């Protein structure tokens, strides 16, 4: 059993037998594109500072994955693929990257939490992603703006 699967079973053991999460399908993943970023952003989630994330619609399409719906469950991993917590998606909005608003930038919990900082950091991140795939980056690229809440931590 993987660490994530064991963590999931630990979470389920805290729930009543009739809870719908006993039948839920989860994904396990870390934030960002490096172990360091997964560690840093995972800690922001654990601290309650980070309650939102953004991802490229194009990446979901290229990977043949669905955009997470409200109610989606994920195990958040650190940079060594160890489980940190379980989150539940509470809101999904799709709009151009450069249409981020101040509240979302704040909720992402990164840097100084301003729109200017958020846009600069996410442009760097998405330029790396797009370059890796041979795609052409655009500031108005369709983006999944996701809000979530932590529903379980080990401690």
Stretch-by-stretch model annotation:
Residues 1-86, 95-155:
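Mixed-charge, low-complexity intrinsically disordered regions
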